[in-house]
Structure formats: C-alpha cells, structure tokens
Swiss-Prot record:
Pfam families: Histidinol_dh (PF00815). The active site is at E327, H328. The gene is hisD. It comes from Methanocaldococcus jannaschii (strain ATCC 43067 / DSM 2661 / JAL-1 / JCM 10045 / NBRC 100440) (Methanococcus jannaschii). NAD(+) binds at Y131, Q193, N216. Catalyzes the sequential NAD-dependent oxidations of L-histidinol to L-histidinaldehyde and then to L-histidine. This is Histidinol dehydrogenase. One of its GO terms (molecular function) is histidinol dehydrogenase activity. The keyword Oxidoreductase applies. Belongs to the histidinol dehydrogenase family.
Length: 429
C-alpha cells in the first residue's frame, strides 16, 4: 500500500528523490498544445458556432443560448438546500471582509522630490472573466474567491464561465453564488473554448481584459496561450500541501489534512515534514487508517505516488518547505508564528492545529486561488491587486525641469535619441 510514498530523512534524500518531490506535477503543455491551439483558433474565427460544437463534443449537451437567464437562477434557488445558500452568504461576508482590508492598504501616492511632483493613482481593470471549473465536481466557493476580489477592486464588468451540467443547465450552487455576489453575467461554457471566448469575445460572450481562476491542464494551457491577448492571474496545477509538524503535532489532524488534500485529485501532492521519527511513523499509520474509511479512496491512493513523509530538525523542515514553495503550508508546531517568520515561499499559510486548509478553501476569508508547482516562489495568490493597475504621473515646472535637464539630455544623446534631448532643450530656451 505504501508503494510510491517516500518516507525518509531529509538529509538522506538522493538528488533524484529530492527533485522528484520538489518538481512535482510540472505540466507537459507541449503534448496537448496542438489540440488547445485548434480550439482557440476555431473560437476566434467562428465564435458561438465553435462554442456550440465543442460543448456538444466535450460536455455532451447541445446549448443554443449560453447566457444564464433570471429564470434559471430562480430555479437554482428552488433546487438547493437553504443551508447551502446560507453557507454561501456567510462565506461571502468573510471573504469580503478580508479583501476589503487588503484594499484599505492600497493607496494613491503623491510626493515631491527636488521640485518634481511624483505620484501614482490606482485604477481597477475594467472587464474580468472568472473561470469556475466543473467536471468531477462543481465549485461555488471558486465563484466567491474569483469574483469578490474583483468586486472589491472596483471592476466594472465581471463574467463567469463554467461548464454545463449533463442536462445543459448551470450548476445550481454555482449560479446562486454568482447571483449573491452580483456578477454581470454567467455563461454555461467550460474548457478551452471558454478561455477562448473570454480572450477573443464571441457574439454572446464579451472579450475581457483579464482571465482568472483554476482549471485542468487544458484550461491552464489555454490561459498560457492567450496571455498577451488578455492578462491572466497565473498558471495553476493540481492541489498541493506541505505540512511542518513537530513532536507536539496531533498525528490524527495531520493525517486528516493529508487526506483532505489528496482527495482533490490523483495528481495532488502532499508532503509532511516532521522533527520526530516517532511522529512520522504515527502519522503514516494514521494516514492509512483514514484511507480505509475515505469515500474517495482510489483518488487518494493514486495521490500517494506524489507524496512523502520527511524527517529532519525544524530548520531542515523550514528549508525544505522554502525549496518546495507549496500552494498550502500548514505549520503544526509549538510556536507556528516563529516558523512563519522564516517562510519565504508559500501560497497561503495555516497556523496551528485548528487552522486546517479547508477553512481557507471555503470560509476564513483568505483566497483559495493559489499558485502551485513552485509558482509561489514568484507569484501571490489571487487578491485585490490582481485586479488593479497603478498609473504613475509626474509634474515639473521650468525650474525643476532645469534641475534634471542635463541628465535627460546626456542620456538621450548617449542612446542616439536626439529628439528626446531636443524636447527638453527647447523648453529651456
């Protein structure tokens, strides 16, 4: 049963073993690129006709009108348990709270330096496309996570695309979440064709300025290929967690959090680093106890191939975590805040035994759209700044222009741009 799962001391890992763990799930875009490019080309050239063709081909349903109607939304409310609606409402409040606090930290700037007025103004991106996955499951939580930061940022138009259900409708909980946030429109289209529609525009779906949201490798590849036509958030892959656990950690909680991540996807990656060999053995045993009871057992067993339990002192665990740059990082130690101070790379961090990853997935208020596959080394998770631009400005009078004219003229002429130099020189005559 333990086949494929590495259990070893960190300092005894071979180079190949360490690379296998750290370089997890590197997407092979090249294999599927021809398929993705063909679909994108068709959507660009044929618009809604291509959307209908690929929706029938991949989703098995014929759809004439992709835009969700008010009647469909009303029907969704009638088909969903009120507890789900209430949970969406409460999650929305927490997510709004945190992202509004983020927004409060982002301010315009106006300063003076040697008589020059310098500044920046913050402006929202106008049109946003939010991709919400479907297929194995539907994710109303992703509706909240992608649309609320855009709302808080002040984006004028926010559109959702999400795959249709087998009866050609939108998933009820997804529709309700979009309605509760108050998006501009929801479209029943998924996959590469949805990304193409948002990037290029069709008769039904407007072209946007930025596309955000997670998806499978086809969706991710499509986002990669339309970047430049539109902005994107980042390229996200299968879900992942790294847990730092010392001897005080509750082995059952560690095992449950491992299972919670592994059940997402057979390609999910789960790594536990612990300071105690005894704790490592205890955690391993608890994991396999929980697997026997799990509903998504086959998926979890497959995910074990991307998993490891590693043993080292606390500094080695922290160093390994920073190399790994996890999407989710749980710190289950005596003093988790002290460990956090040494963390350089992570999408989102969960401190202490009562802060499991699922709270961030749904309701704590932070965002669950996070960088994977080491992208946390250079990317932040989705946040209000994803949907903002900072426009700089400057204002000089004749005196302040005179103070820097020699710098501008000298550098412009050194670069052979004599028109640049003359634009300054003439103003000072």
């Amino acid at each position: 049963m333990v086949t494929g799962m590495i259990i070893k001391k960190i300092k005894e890992l071979t180079k190949e073993e360490e690379e296998k763990i750290i370089n997890r799930n590197k997407a092979n875009f090249e294999e599927i690129l021809p398929t993705v490019m063909e679909i994108l080309k068709d959507v660009k050239e044929k618009g809604d006709e291509a959307l209908k063709y690929y929706t029938k081909k991949f989703d098995g349903v014929e759809i004439e009108d992709f835009k969700v109607t008010d009647e469909e939304i009303e029907e969704a409310y009638n088909s969903v348990d009120y507890k789900v609606v209430e949970a969406i409402e409460r999650a929305k409040e927490n997510i709004y709270f945190f992202h509004k606090k983020q927004m409060e930290q982002i301010k315009d700037l106006n300063v003076e330096n040697n008589g020059i007025i310098l500044g920046q103004v913050v402006r929202a991106i106008e049109k946003v496309g939010c991709y919400v996955p479907g297929g194995r499951a539907f994710y109303p939580s992703t509706v909240l996570m992608t649309t609320i930061p855009a709302k808080v940022a002040g984006c004028e138009e926010i559109y959702i695309t999400s795959p249709p259900t087998k009866d050609g409708k939108g998933n009820p909980a997804t529709l309700i979440a979009g309605d509760i946030v108050g998006v501009s429109a929801i479209y029943k289209v998924g996959g590469v064709q949805a990304i193409g529609a948002l990037a290029y525009g069709t008769e039904t779906i407007p072209k946007v300025d930025i596309i955000v949201g997670p998806g499978n490798i086809y969706v991710t590849t499509a986002k990669k290929m339309v970047y430049g036509e539109v902005a994107i958030d980042f390229l996200a892959g299968p879900s992942e967690v790294l847990i730092i656990a010392d001897e005080t950690a509750n082995a059952e909680f560690v095992a449950l959090d491992f299972i919670a991540q592994a059940e997402h996807d057979p390609n999910a990656s789960c790594v536990i680093t612990t300071t105690s060999e005894k704790k490592a053995e205890e955690i391993k045993n608890k994991i396999f106890e929980e697997i026997e009871k799990a509903e998504r057992k086959e998926i979890i067993l497959k995910a074990l191939e991307n998993s490891a339990i590693l043993i080292g002192d606390l500094e080695e665990c922290i160093e390994f975590s920073n190399k790994y740059a996890p999407e989710h990082l749980e710190i289950l130690t005596k003093n988790p805040e002290e460990v956090l101070n040494k963390i350089k790379h992570a999408g989102s961090v969960f401190l202490g035994e009562y802060s499991p990853v699922p709270v961030g997935d749904y309701a704590s208020g932070t965002n669950h759209v996070l960088p994977t596959s080491q992208f946390a080394r250079m990317s932040s998770g989705l946040n209000v700044e994803t949907f903002l631009k900072k426009i700089t400005y400057q204002k000089l009078d004749k005196e302040s222009l005179k103070n820097i004219a020699d710098i501008v003229i000298t550098l412009a002429e050194a670069e052979g741009l004599f028109g640049h130099a003359e634009a300054v020189r003439r103003r000072l005559k």
